[in-house]
Amino acid sequence: SLILNGKQLASIISAEIAQQTAVLAIKPRLAIILVGNNLASEIYIRNKISCAKSLNIETQLIRLPSTATKNNILEIIKSLNEDPTINGIIVQAPLPNKNFQETVFEAIDPRKDVDGFTPANIGRLCNGNRNCLVACTPLGIWKLLSYYNISLSGKHVVILGRSRIVGRPLSILLSQKFEGCNATVTVCNSQTKHLAEIINLFFVLV
């Protein structure tokens, strides 16, 4: 079996992006909305800001208390959607109040939807439309397979997990008629029976 190491590819892509952004008269700007004081979210945001800085991407961190209402957040997103100086928007998940989390994601302009969570981007991906923003981890996996010249056409891929961040969009992506894809995909979850037998059938395990 072959374990793919993404660090080398990540360095190559990062260098290319940094080179492209270095010559821009106006730097790209990423707005990040952080609601509450989730420790894991704080770490993720700190890493994202550090990465953006290394790529010559400016960031605007908007902190909101855990008591922020749906309307509070939607008003900020509306303002960011309309701001021509903002190129990308991230709402760090999970929100303290998950009851309106989907509504918040849906409010982001699909063209600025860095995480690829909006119905417009997910719908385009489902329809095989390459003109969409794809969730970062699935897109990274696709690029990694391409980097290693691995084609999944006709192959069986087993994905462990069906999260909206990785498993679900990845299963859609790898089953499309895109270059290197065209795979037969099995998505397993916590209720999957005979998992060991299924895993034994895989060509690629994610």
Regions found by a protein language model. Give the residues of each.
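Non-catalytic terminal and connector segments of soluble metabolic enzymes
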Residues: 2, 54, 81, 108-111, ...
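Short beta-strand segments enriched in small/hydrophobic residues
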Residues: 27-37
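Glycine-rich phosphate/diphosphate-binding loop of Rossmann-like nucleotide-binding domains
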Residues: 35-49, 129-206
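Anion-binding alpha/beta catalytic cores of soluble intermediary-metabolism enzymes, centered on
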Residues: 88-157
